[in-house]
Amino acid sequence: MSECTCHKNYTLDTLIPKVGVITKITQETPDVKTFCVTAPGGGKMFDHMPGQCAMVCVPGVGEAMFSITSSPTNKEYQEFSIKKCGVLTDCLHSLEVGDEITVRGPYGNNFPVDTELKGKNLLFIAGGIGLAPLRSVINYVLDNRDDYGTVDILYGSRSADDLVKLKEIQEVWAKTPGVNVHLTIDRPQEGWDGHVGFVPTYLKEIGFSTDKTALVCGPPIMIKFVLAGLEELGFNRSQCYTTLELRMKCGIGKCGRCNIGSKYVCKDG
């Protein structure tokens, strides 16, 4: 087996579960809730960077890796937008404000917001719950607005009811100078007067210029066709970033669950 040459991006502290108190729960869509979590005495449980994730656990039920959807600039709490799709997430969706969970992390590489992305025009492309990891980056960029160029956000879902953080998108992001928001849903829906069509198709219809760096997250099949669409528009690989945490388990390159050849999603990704 080829030796992994990834850097050590964790410490002992990231391996120790920390108690988190649920202080707010927002019903985003019929099957997605956002959980606001703090340390028992208030404040964030740990520091993180945009794009990183954490292992969320309900003791006695199980644990899984979820993206941290809040920005590092938020010093009061961390947020996780979680889709109900299994035993653990069913249990998480049954919890109430005041309940406790455990969280360990952060894990995974972050988007290079302070290096490669700084000063660049940014294009965020998300599908469904894939907005959650990108929201951390988007809000970080908006909180440090002078450090970045123009921002385009292309976001789509199956229906208008499945658009996560729609109020924030319309009332904050869309009203921020230099930010352009493009929303779409897969099929026509009563009451929806916006664009109708799949994200990869809408991407090519808009025809974004190649003076941008693209950050992509969503269902694997969407990512595949979005990256192909970006290539058709003239984007090269160095201009495209995507995120993947579905295969991650330990988060530190030890369990081998997320390896692709000699690379590890959690550390090389």
Where are these predicted regions, by residue range?
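Ferredoxin-reductase
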Residues: 4-99, 157-159
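FNR/FR-type flavoprotein reductase catalytic core
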Residues: 87-249
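Short, structured interface segments that constitute the first stable element of a domain
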Residues: 1-5, 211
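Local cysteine-cluster metal-coordination motifs and their immediate loop/turn environment
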Residues: 2-3, 221, 244-269
